[in-house]
Amino acid sequence: MKPLRKQGIIIFSILALVLAACGGGTTEETVEEAAPEVVETLDSPAVTTAAGVKTGVGVTSDPCPAEVGGVPTMADDSKGCIYLGMLNDYTGPYAAVAPALETAQRGFWMWVNSTGGIGDYSVVIREGVDTAYNPQKHLEAYNAQREEVAALAMSLGTPQTLFILDEMDKDNMVGAPMSWYSGWSYKSVDRGLVVEFGSAYCADGMNALDWAMASLPVDIKTIGIMGFAGDYGTDWANGIKYAAEKAGVTVAWEYLPPTLEFDVAQAVGLMVTQPVDAYFPAVGPTQMAQVAGGAFQQGLTPIA
């Protein structure tokens, strides 16, 4: 696993270079030439900033705001501003984790700004737009920001991001999905617009079974899988099933409904009526807590 600091620098470097090449939209653009600059502090490795950032959609010579939504940006008021979009889930199944995801995103760009920004620019994320983890609302949220941002700092969800790819392609809009879908590794899927980071759900599924067989205090011969269809659950399940086939482990059952159709009672019912040696869930934090609580009430102490 890559150290988080190194991984963050790689993501920043890629996005900085892409922003240098993409100004977005059809509005008139100007280019301000900037010599490559190395910015370094005692707390961070050296970062070479991008030269020739284009002004246009989401990029302005005016300074960034000092705060967004009450959160400081650490922007330099003597520099221009690069604006990024935020498509988050504030009211849907991932509302519980939305604040932490957003805090991390904003914190990263605060750090970037505090170490010199990108050439003659600071970077800020605009106010997040609620998608409720719904593809159609995700598109509406994208439309609300597409003329105001140079790239997406975060697009939460795999099906949701796939749903807006056509529009992103029209805008030449790059983004960093909060999603580790294995399809992002293929240009035929992401059209070269996705800033990929981390390991894919499929690989994580393989590793999960491998780790469980080596580390858990049971002889795992049968397993159950639950997750969200068409989301990370399917990708995760495919990895687990592939590893199970190679290891001679039987997948006794799968419960993979669409995200908004996940039934906690049905999931717990499978655990009670079709017991297995280990369970491999890939659901949201709220659903996971409900499933674990329901299983405990039924007398189960699942290994998950």
Q: How does the language model describe each region?
A:
Residues G69, A96-T103, T115-S188, F197, ...:
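Beta-alpha junction/loop-to-helix N-cap segments that form part of ligand/metal-binding clefts
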Residues G69-G70, V149-Y255, I303-A304:
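Extracytoplasmic ligand/sensor domains, especially the bilobed periplasmic-binding protein
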Residues L84, T103-I125, V218, E245-V249:
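Signal peptide-proximal N-terminal region
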Residues D171, A237-A304:
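Extracellular/periplasmic bilobed ligand-binding domains
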